[in-house]
């Protein structure tokens, strides 16, 4: 495998430079004096920022072979790039060194004394952001690579000068097995990405391999609510610390209460028997576990708890995580990235504690594979809303070979006893909302695709 010498800048080309992680890696290289170029289908705020910082970006679909020139020293590509991609094929033809995004990020981690990798089926971006805010509050000068936009740094990347490096670690295509963490976090393990993994056992095996990456002087924080979590940690040389919802874990909460906007206050019970109070600035019960992971890590790093508590109180989430978008005709519009049944349920449970008359959920299913695999679970989770509106399935990297559509999900939601409407276009959905939602209603757009545009379109009308 090609080894990058980060002390000697070269020309790196990113296929898919506009992705949230790829754009962050590109920005790190620009800050270190590298020549950066790349391609993406469409112009975005992320690519425009890179261009202003000195990168050259080629736009268009398909990405063209002539973009790959022999002055490029290294090509970095995402998991979404297939062998028939013209740029990918041309780089192979020219025998240019090539690394996947995960391989490149793994090599970057090696340059830091304390690389921290945050993994789990759900909650990675929120927890990575919580940790980031704590490290910033404590003036530790960390380098951060986040899967969402963190408002306090006006982006998803921060280049620091200490030995701390924090990054999300995604299990899809076993990407996180290319990393070199000293500290690892496993937030949860559930079925997902079944276009790659065979089943839950296959996913658990991948997380076990991730845990085995940690060195003997490292630490793994794992959610003690994960069923048979000991199977993941058995035989590890590193230290293992648990967090969870019950006293069986090393870190756990008690005396939980919520304010009128569903933010939690609770007592944190710690490994050493210490108890401390914590109030979160984000909504929902699921964020208690995320916060406990962040607190446990902060204790390991000997961060003053006053900094930890202040950072978590002032953290109000990243973009697309229960993000307040605005109000139109007295209708509150919130957007959320949830695209898995567990995430949907967590978001809607949080919304139920938020002031509202009728809770509307506009859901855009993400990928045919996931929709087919979790169809009954999606219906049960969506039925937590008072009324549901469905958009067409967002294909992402897939083509429809499964014969599945949002109409199948609509039928199951209706069987759960809830009104469910299905429209093929965003314009139809927007018109329906304006005719049927009333003052005091709460409207959540939900999904990992472009469903966020519905709320933004409504607010601009």
Pin down the residues of each PLM region.
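Beta-strand->loop->alpha-helix junctions that form or flank phosphate-binding loops
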Residues: 39, 58-62, 99-106, 145-148, ...
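Conserved N-terminal Rossmann-fold NAD(P)-binding element of oxidoreductases
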Residues: 12-17, 446
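C-terminal helical cap/extension that packs against the catalytic core
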Residues: 379-439
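NAD(P)-binding Rossmann-fold cofactor-contacting core
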Residues: 35-49
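Nucleotide phosphate-binding/pyrophosphate-handling subdomain across enzymes
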Residues: 2-13, 21, 25-32, 112, ...
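Phosphate-binding loop of NTP-binding sites
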Residues: 5, 28-34, 51, 65-68, ...
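Short acidic/histidine-rich motifs immediately flanking catalytic phosphotransfer sites
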Residues: 69-74, 163, 439-441
């Amino acid at each position: 495998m090609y080894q990058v010498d980060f002390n000697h800048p070269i020309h790196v080309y990113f296929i898919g430079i506009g992705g949230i992680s790829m754009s962050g890696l590109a920005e790190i290289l620009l800050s270190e004096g590298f020549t950066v170029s790349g391609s993406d289908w469409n112009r975005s705020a992320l690519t425009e920022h890179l261009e202003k910082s000195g990168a050259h970006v080629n736009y268009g679909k398909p990405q063209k072979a002539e973009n790959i020139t022999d002055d490029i020293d290294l090509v970095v590509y995402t998991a979404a790039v297939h062998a028939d991609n013209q740029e990918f094929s041309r780089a192979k033809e020219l025998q240019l060194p090539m690394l996947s995004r995960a391989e490149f990020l793994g090599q970057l981690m090696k340059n830091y004394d304390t690389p921290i990798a945050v993994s789990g089926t759900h909650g990675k971006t929120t927890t990575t952001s919580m940790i980031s805010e704590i490290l910033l509050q404590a003036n530790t000068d960390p380098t951060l690579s986040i899967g969402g936009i963190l408002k306090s740094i006006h982006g998803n990347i921060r280049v620091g000068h200490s030995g701390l490096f924090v990054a999300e670690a995604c299990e899809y295509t076993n990407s996180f097995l290319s990393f070199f963490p000293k500290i690892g976090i496993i937030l949860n393990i559930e079925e997902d990405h079944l276009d790659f993994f065979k089943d839950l056992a296959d996913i658990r095996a991948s997380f076990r391999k991730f845990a085995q990456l940690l060195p003997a002087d490292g630490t793994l924080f794992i959610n003690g609510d994960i069923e048979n979590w000991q199977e993941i940690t058995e035989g590890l040389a590193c230290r293992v610390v648990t967090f969870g919802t019950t006293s069986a874990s090393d870190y756990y909460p008690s005396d939980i209460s919520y304010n009128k906007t569903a933010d939690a206050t609770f007592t944190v019970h710690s490994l050493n028997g210490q108890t401390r109070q914590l109030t979160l600035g984000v909504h929902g019960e699921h964020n208690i576990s995320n916060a406990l992971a962040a607190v446990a890590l902060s204790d390991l790093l000997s961060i003053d708890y006053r900094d930890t508590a202040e950072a978590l109180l002032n953290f109000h989430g990243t973009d697309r995580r229960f993000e307040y978008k605005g109000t139109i005709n007295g209708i509150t519009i919130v957007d959320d990235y949830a695209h898995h049944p567990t995430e949907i349920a967590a978001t809607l449970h949080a919304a139920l504690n938020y002031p509202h008359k009728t809770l509307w959920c506009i859901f855009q299913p993400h990928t045919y594979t996931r929709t087919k695999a979790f169809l009954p679970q999606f219906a049960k989770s969506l039925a937590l809303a008072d009324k549901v509106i469905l958009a067409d399935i967002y294909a992402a990297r897939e083509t429809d070979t499964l014969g599945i559509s949002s109409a199948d999900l609509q039928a199951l939601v209706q069987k759960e006893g809830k009104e469910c409407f299905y429209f093929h276009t965003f314009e139809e959905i927007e018109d329906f909302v304006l005719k049927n939602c009333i003052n005091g209603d709460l409207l959540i757009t939900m999904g990992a695709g472009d469903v966020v545009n519905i709320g933004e379109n409504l607010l601009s009308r």
